[in-house]
Structure formats: structure tokens, C-alpha cells
């Protein structure tokens, strides 16, 4: 058994289904949305992660992370590696210049743990610190607000080998130490910190389905796992993620925040779940799915504990927070980052209750079947509904939409990017509706700034608003029409379809 949503995400990365989404996006209504419709302090930006764009995996003292090792084992569908990626490690000045030309107000990037602490702890690599100092300073020189993510699925392989990474509580202390170094070295210039990217997705992909490294699940699973326990490990990993996040926030608030005056939060993959049918069973199943997928991360942040339905269905396999841990986790955010791409359709699956506990996984504990409907999966109303849900159920926390984007095939046509434009404009319009209805949403980041190494498909899928030619050693960057549209939107210019074209950098 394998979590159906992860299988769906993988399928959505593959070219055949991406083509379906392109056709669907061409049929989207265009939103008449303007930059002036948003509050003046609202930021529009774009994002990437170190793993996906930097390359230079063995230069200047950097050691391997789990993805560097995994990609060399041939696990990617296209057999690609993280070795070079977009080579942003060497080309960050060029990339920041492109951001500035587009008019990005903010850039969300991540810091590579093994570039800062090559051995996971202890020795601080001055070359790694220098790189991020240079990147941050260059962003600020161009008037771009740095939003830094401390961990984006790329912990040191040495810690995975030493004690099993996120399955061990030792990771909490090592992550906190690493975060402390980041705050100390960069916090005087970084205004927005995200501790961990998508812990709910990592816990499922790495420890439930085994789809991403370290590829653990109840053997053999859909991905031929050799070790793991899908009935226990995803919950254990998520528990450690939350405690590590809260521990890092405590360090930041105690030692740095008063002087540095930055904000800190956690990023959550924001599922919007809708019932497959109007039956009572599917409606109740949708409530369960929302609690499991989203409440798993959000409830502890706001209430200090996991959702009641999770405790009922998972039982003793779900770790418990001590009183002190609950107090530490509760309120451990100044904002919540949400990543959102698709609507998930939920169907009740009562037969899962008969699955033996030793064979259970996340799906069977939820007792639902989750799927994405081609043609409906990119419904922009999903983002509006998700933001409304956080407003109504979590006290309307400050939210940044950290990721939202459109995947196209590797061989995308360079003279046609209208599908991505309609996708982005549709979601921006939906987000605006949520803001008008009271959501405290403060920023939007397109995923992604440029085509990159995608964790489920390597270089087979392109999410960037900037095209990267991976077949050319120069890795030539080109602005896609979506970059031009986004630029004109941010700069408050009107653009007709005939005026949009590719431009080379």
C-alpha cells in the first residue's frame, strides 16, 4: 500500500499528465487582478531551494546530503543528479540580476546544511558562510527581501548514517545547533526565516511510501523498500520535525529576535481536500483527510497537540507531547508558510479499518482514498478555500504562500507559456478573494524562479518562470512569457498576450 496522494504527485510530474494540465490551464478564466489590489506591504516573489539549483555539491568544503547520495544511486526517473543543477552556486549574481530585472520583491531560498556544517555539527565551513553572505548581500543590493529556509529536505548523509536522521530525537539538537549558526551568521539581514519546508510531505514521502530518500516503508511497498515501518515511522519523524522546529524558534526568540527583528515560521504543504461525492461518508472522510494531511502540522502549532481524530485512529503509534513539549510547540510561529498546487478529492474507504496494524500506513489510518482529477486539479478556488480554512480554524495566522506553480514538460514550447500565465494569475486572483474576505495573507512566491532539479522527476518537468537550457553547458537562462507577465504585474503595467515573448539573458 502506498499513499495515493504521493503517487498522484508523481504522475502530475510526468509529461503525459502535464500535457493534460497545460490544456486545462488554457481553459482557465483570466483574473483581472492588479498589484494595486493588494496591500502595500504585501510581497510578490519567487522561490527555489539549495538542493534544486545550487549544484557544486563537492566544492569549497561541502559534503553530501541525502539527495546528493541518492541521485547518484540512479533513483531519479531520468537518472539525473544534483551535481550541477542550475549552477547557482557560481551564478548567483547573474540570477539575482534576473530577479531584479523581473522586479521580484522577495526571494525565497534555502540554506544547504552540509555547506555550512559539513559534518552535521561542529566545524563551521567559512566558504559556505561566505556564499550565503554574498547571496544575501546581493539580494539586498538589488532591493530584494531575503526569505531563508533553514531545511529543505537535504540533511547531511553523515547524520543519516550515524543515527537514522529524523527517526532519532538526536536530530532535534543537531538541527537546533545548525539553525543557531544560521541565525548568528545571517540573521542581521534575513527578515523572514522558515525552519523546515513541508515536514508533512517529507514524513510521508520518506517514511510512509518510501518514494524519497531515505526510502523507508513497510517492505516491499510500492517503491521496493528494504527497511522501514509505515505504521510508525512517519509519525515519529513528524514528531521530531515539530520539536526541532519549536526548539529552533525558541533559540531565535531567546537570543536573536529582539535585536534582529525578524520573523520565523514553519512551512506546511497545504492540502485542500474536497469530497469525491456529496455523500455523508465522503464529507466525513474529507474532514478526516484535512485533519491528517494539514492538521497534523497546523494543530500542534496552534493548539499544542495533534488532531483528535488522529489520536483516535492511530492510537499509541502516534507520539505524545509532554506538557513542556506542548507548550514549546504551541505558538512557535510568527507566520505559517503554505505550499499549494492542487485540489485533492477524497473518498471514504471503510475497508481500511480491517487492515492489521502492522500493515497500516497513513492512508489506512485516515481510511480514505485521495486522488487528483486531471482537469480539476489546478482549481484556484482550492487556495482561496485553504486560506479561509486557516482563517476560520486557526485564528487567522499571518500566512505566506511559499509555493504555487505550474509544471510543464521538459520539451516545453518556448513560444507558448500561456498555460502557466493563466495558472499563476488565477491563483493570485483566488488569493486576493481570500484577502478581501479577511485572510491575513502577506506574500506570494511563484514556484519556481527558474527551472530546476525537481525532487520527483529530476529535469523532466519545468516549473520555472525562467527557462534553463540543461542541454547546453552554459545553462543559458531565458525569461519565459510568464516571467514577463509577472514582471508587468509587479511593476503595475498592463500587458496584452501579443506583447509577451521570450527574452534571453
UniProtKB/Swiss-Prot annotation:
<feature type="glycosylation site" description="N-linked (GlcNAc...) asparagine">
    <location>
        <position position="494"/>
    </location>
</feature>
<dbReference type="GO" id="GO:0005975">
    <property type="term" value="P:carbohydrate metabolic process"/>
</dbReference>
<comment type="similarity">
    <text>Belongs to the glycosyl hydrolase 1 family.</text>
</comment>
<dbReference type="GO" id="GO:0102457">
    <property type="term" value="F:cyanidin 3-O-glucoside 7-O-glucosyltransferase (acyl-glucose) activity"/>
</dbReference>
<feature type="disulfide bond">
    <location>
        <begin position="217"/>
        <end position="225"/>
    </location>
</feature>
<feature type="active site" description="Proton donor">
    <location>
        <position position="198"/>
    </location>
</feature>
<feature type="binding site">
    <location>
        <position position="52"/>
    </location>
    <ligand>
        <name>a beta-D-glucoside</name>
    </ligand>
</feature>
<keyword id="KW-0328">Glycosyltransferase</keyword>
<feature type="binding site">
    <location>
        <position position="341"/>
    </location>
    <ligand>
        <name>a beta-D-glucoside</name>
    </ligand>
</feature>
<comment type="pathway">
    <text>Pigment biosynthesis; anthocyanin biosynthesis.</text>
</comment>
<dbReference type="GO" id="GO:0016758">
    <property type="term" value="F:hexosyltransferase activity"/>
</dbReference>
<feature type="binding site">
    <location>
        <position position="152"/>
    </location>
    <ligand>
        <name>a beta-D-glucoside</name>
    </ligand>
</feature>
<dbReference type="GO" id="GO:0009718">
    <property type="term" value="P:anthocyanin-containing compound biosynthetic process"/>
</dbReference>
<dbReference type="Pfam" id="PF00232">
    <property type="entry name" value="Glyco_hydro_1"/>
</dbReference>
<feature type="binding site">
    <location>
        <position position="447"/>
    </location>
    <ligand>
        <name>a beta-D-glucoside</name>
    </ligand>
</feature>
<feature type="glycosylation site" description="N-linked (GlcNAc...) asparagine">
    <location>
        <position position="411"/>
    </location>
</feature>
<keyword id="KW-0926">Vacuole</keyword>
<feature type="binding site">
    <location>
        <position position="463"/>
    </location>
    <ligand>
        <name>a beta-D-glucoside</name>
    </ligand>
</feature>
<feature type="glycosylation site" description="N-linked (GlcNAc...) asparagine">
    <location>
        <position position="229"/>
    </location>
</feature>
<comment type="function">
    <text>Beta-glycosidase that catalyzes the transfer of glucose moiety to anthocyanidin 3-glucoside at the 7 position. Anthocyanins are ubiquitous colored pigments that are responsible for variations in petal color.</text>
</comment>
<keyword id="KW-0732">Signal</keyword>
<feature type="glycosylation site" description="N-linked (GlcNAc...) asparagine">
    <location>
        <position position="437"/>
    </location>
</feature>
<feature type="active site" description="Nucleophile">
    <location>
        <position position="403"/>
    </location>
</feature>
<feature type="signal peptide">
    <location>
        <begin position="1"/>
        <end position="25"/>
    </location>
</feature>
<feature type="glycosylation site" description="N-linked (GlcNAc...) asparagine">
    <location>
        <position position="224"/>
    </location>
</feature>
<keyword id="KW-0325">Glycoprotein</keyword>
<dbReference type="GO" id="GO:0008422">
    <property type="term" value="F:beta-glucosidase activity"/>
</dbReference>
<protein>
    <recommendedName>
        <fullName>Cyanidin 3-O-glucoside 7-O-glucosyltransferase (acyl-glucose)</fullName>
        <ecNumber>2.4.1.300</ecNumber>
    </recommendedName>
</protein>
<feature type="binding site">
    <location>
        <begin position="197"/>
        <end position="198"/>
    </location>
    <ligand>
        <name>a beta-D-glucoside</name>
    </ligand>
</feature>
<dbReference type="InterPro" id="IPR001360">
    <property type="entry name" value="Glyco_hydro_1"/>
</dbReference>
<dbReference type="InterPro" id="IPR017853">
    <property type="entry name" value="Glycoside_hydrolase_SF"/>
</dbReference>
<feature type="glycosylation site" description="N-linked (GlcNAc...) asparagine">
    <location>
        <position position="324"/>
    </location>
</feature>
<feature type="binding site">
    <location>
        <position position="403"/>
    </location>
    <ligand>
        <name>a beta-D-glucoside</name>
    </ligand>
</feature>
<keyword id="KW-1015">Disulfide bond</keyword>
<keyword id="KW-0808">Transferase</keyword>
<dbReference type="GO" id="GO:0000325">
    <property type="term" value="C:plant-type vacuole"/>
</dbReference>
